[in-house]
Amino acid sequence: DALLQSSAQDRMIFASGYQYTGQPILLTEFGGVAFKTNQSEKDWGYCAIEKNEASYIRRLTSLFSYIKTNRRIQGYCYTQFTDVMQETNGLLSIRREPKIAIDAIRAILFGTDDSEPISPVP
């Protein structure tokens, strides 16, 4: 509820004169969790670059858990699927190789085989 009354990155959620009346909320870009698998000095991320695999997994898990359990959010797009040039925000490297075990990525995105996947849809 507080989010709907504020701005995101200094941008209003709704245009002047409009308000939330129950319409689906789509998070059209989120993520930016940087984790480099090479040692380039030019690597960049939106936040501090995660230093190791464990902290990267914790950060991703935290983000996805919040998004998927928020009942108002009906869809989302993670940024980004792969690293590009100097940005290390991808789930996969620039060579399209998973940065962590593919099973770990799957568990973060969809849950584990022994649990129900978390769904944003009530």
Role assignments for model-derived ranges:
Residues D1-P122:
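Substrate-binding clefts and catalytic carboxylate motifs of secreted carbohydrate-active enzymes
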